[in-house]
Amino acid sequence: MADFNEYKGVWVFCEQRQGALMSTDFELVSEARKLADELGCEVTGLLLGDNVEGIAKELGGYGADKVMVCDSPLLKDYTTDAYAKVVCDMVNEYKPEVLLIGATNIGRDLGPRCAARLHTGLTADATHLDIDTAKYVEFLKESSTIDLSKQKFDYEDRNLKMTRPAFGGHLMATIICPRFRPQMSTVRPGVMKKAPFDQAKADACQIVKPAFSLTADDIKTEVLSVEK
């Protein structure tokens, strides 16, 4: 089992397409900011692509303290091989406690592959996230028919509580990952509220360009064209 004391921070994989950030990025960074404030840690965006440093600071306006920019022509278009390698290498190097990924077509491909390589769990298509157990209990009061008076809750629990619909939406399941790190979830687009953009925070956002290893030999697929 990993030493949990080594894992700090809430990370968001920030998806870009043709050099433009996705609205899901801003939703997830905004939600990550809330979680990080409860954990007392930083929010870090992880941005992969080719010549994408110029769009990174916008993520700071929604709550990112820093953005790790991995720039390479080999990352211009999404390929599972390249992106999974770089994301996992960054996670193994910097050890975030939480990693959020948008449940887009790309995120649904990338998330499970990274979780398998990192030997951790993944909650798919989450629609609600909590750290604070008291807030989670309030969420249950508002959204479920459970008799909470008969339930026992550990109010000292600081695991990420990831809630997602199951059985066609007839059941809401809350999942935790208490034994492995990072705690990973893909998050359904459009369900998290985007914070108002703050230009001062965007200006203050730190841009980091970490060293990483990626060669053409790491990539088994070739992108012939991208159709919109």
Predicted regions and their residues:
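N-terminal glycine-rich FAD/FM-binding segment characteristic of electron-transfer flavoproteins
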Residues: 1-228
